[in-house]
Amino acid sequence: MYNLFKSVIETDRSAVVICDVNHKIVYMNKMAVTRYHKDLTGSSLLDCHNAKSNEIIVKVVDWFRQSPKNNMIYTYHNTKENKDVYMVALRDDEENLIGYYEKHEYRNPETAELYDFSKSLI
């Protein structure tokens, strides 16, 4: 089963970077390594962003911790690449937060408000 799941991630055309709850990068798919020009596995995601971005990342992860219903939040639209970007909670079978990742969806613009903490999108 592991190989099936890994294959899904590895064949995704979007960069996939998975972090644990302490912001440590635990996995990058091939597209992520290509996009960011190196494998950052083992590094802190917070070392890859500026202070303002780090503040938002920490706030989102805190929101994920508040409720098992808080699982996905819209973060921005990239007009140049026509994609929406989300942060997504990863949970174990007991719905405990075990990590998160950034999801890129290439499509029409999102209709939700940016960082709308009043609802989860999934």
Question: Could you say what each language-model-derived stretch is?
Answer:
Residues 1-32:
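Sensory modules in modular signal-transduction proteins
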Residues 27, 31-116:
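Sensory/regulatory domains in signal-transduction proteins
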Residues 120-122:
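Non-catalytic regulatory/interaction regions at protein termini and inter-domain linkers
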